[in-house]
Amino acid sequence: MPLIPDFFARAMAAFGVGSGDALAVAVSGGADSMALMKAAADFGKQNKNRVVVLTVDHGLRSESAAEARHVAQWAEKLGVESEILVWRGEKPETGVEQAAREHRYALLFDACRRLKIENLLLGHHKRDQAETFLMRRARGSGEIGLAGMSAVKSFAFGRMLRPFLGIEPSKLRAFARENGLPWVDDPTNATMQFERGRLRQTATSAELEEAFRQTLVYGKKRRETEEQTAAFYARFLTLSPMGYAVLEQDAFLTDCPVLPYALGEILRVVANVPYAPEKTAVESLVSRLKSGFRGCTLGGCRIAPLARRRVLIWREERSLPPAVSFDETGFAYWGGFAVAVSGAPFENFTVDALNRPLKTEINVPKRVVPTLPAIFENEKLCIVPHLGYKQNQMSCQAVFSPVFPLVQTAEWMPPLTV
């Protein structure tokens, strides 16, 4: 069997992807993702897996719509489904690279949720991983960040899988060329305007090889850290389905080496953001929690003492997102909550923060209540699912599903390297 198909099949086995498991494939139109699309399409045919290609039209370049159509056309030629996901709305004038990445993932995650596909394949390869290490090291990242990208990582509606994380991009290009797959080179990948583009023009092969080797070392360390963190959570943490967290005060009397990391991850999940606050800020918070702490805010969260020697962590009201409407299926994602309604027309309904006190017999800290998701019809309060408040016949369910869940010992090592 040729190198890439065999490599892909072994990676899928390592990821626990079985016959019949649906696969979503993120394809930009570059050589690496086109190779991924071909490998996934062939694998799907052999193993009876549904394969759906997802390509994002980001609208940042005049060619982006045509490039997305190019991907969809090749998906059809390979006999797999495809969808073009469009980033609508205004584009930022600064921080474009980061904003584009965040919107791309948001569109991909929502498509996986809508299509009920739990496995999202990404085409990152060995050089991408090495470049990520070098960029993070230049920014002063610690051991956690220097592990680079994970081979497997959970998100709200499934898993991100990177089967090619240990393979050279030259081998992916050769595979694409052998199969007659035309690709598009994104000019922003080579421009000096962006950090990765600058790195690609300056990093040597030896530097990249050593950087990748270092990600394997730090990946092993990160996995050990996450295993210790999981044990810490089991002992000291209660994460409520209402989106707040309670930590036992005794957690701050220990000399647990993962305490700052564990606390940062809790803040990230409660705030429903991609990254934890800066390490120094979290370490300062740990010091305060160990000595006469009265309360503070950090990373979009509020932290305060709670009765019976506990600490309450909940969403800061000013950091809550704006109201969102339901899609045509009656689904909305708001502030880390997956909200679904049915049983009545919902065109005029929105999800927003309750933003007011409300008497309830449900056992919930009063300070948390205004931050809970609520359903409004033309600004009139109708339902607060977590509190049992209901003023119409509509059925509603709200599940706390942060974009990236609390640490679950992701796999930071590539399944195979070539």
What are these regions (language model features)?
Residues L60, L146, L172, L199, ...:
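Long, contiguous hydrophobic alpha-helical segments, chiefly transmembrane helices and signal peptides
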Residues L60-R61, E97-Q98, L161-R162, N189, ...:
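A generic secondary-structure micro-motif detector
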Residues I4-A9, A13-A31, R50-V52, W87-G89, ...:
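AMP-forming adenylation/ATP pyrophosphatase catalytic core
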Residues M1-M135, S170-K171, R177-E178, E379:
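ATP-dependent adenylation/nucleotidyltransferase module used to activate substrates
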Residues E118-N119, H125-Y275:
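Flexible helical/loop "lid" subdomain adjacent to adenine-nucleotide binding pockets
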Residues A100, A203, F376:
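Regulatory helix in c-di-GMP signaling enzymes, encompassing the GGDEF I-site helix
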Residues A31, S62, K91, A99, ...:
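Residue-level detector of secondary-structure boundary/capping sites
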